[in-house]
UniProtKB/Swiss-Prot annotation:
Mg(2+) binds at E81, E85. Keywords: Hydrolase, Magnesium, Metal-binding. It comes from Listeria innocua serovar 6a (strain ATCC BAA-680 / CLIP 11262). Belongs to the Nudix hydrolase family. Its cofactor is Mg(2+). One of its GO terms (molecular function) is hydrolase activity. This is Uncharacterized Nudix hydrolase lin0387. Its EC number is 3.6.-.-. Residues 28-157 form the Nudix hydrolase domain.
Amino acid sequence: MEEWDLLNENRELTRKTHIRGEKLAPGELHLVVHVCIFNEKGQLLIQKRQKDKEGWPNYWDLSAAGSALKGETSRQAAEREVKEELGMTIDLSNTRAKFSYHFEAGFDDYWFITKDVELSDLTLQTEEVADVRFVTKEKLEALRSSGEFIPYFFLNQLFELKNATTIHF
């Protein structure tokens, strides 16, 4: 049983929790994290979701993602999801989420790191992850165009956001 903290519109804890799989009531918000892992060549690590995964089965997705569990910060959730899904330990203590997207059911924090990773060193969570690979910006766009990648509206900007230190060009 996965339990999430519920937040208000200001991202403050409400002292209420939610059980994954139950319907969120209007105004109940929770925290989700996505991690984008780039290698030194500037390629993005992506994962293919299992064909029986709830939500976007058999689609390619960002490096790792999931909901924050009760008591977790965004950073802790991001580190845990990478460990669970890819078997890789990362340390985000000296970084911040690159951006946060507010969606109907909560907040989605996006973490970006650059780390050279050997695919053969990863231990995939077989219940969730079917495959992994590194892709260029062009290959990512081809996967999105062919309907194989989850259609995040900001995919074209991911590679620019990776190195951005300001919101201006």
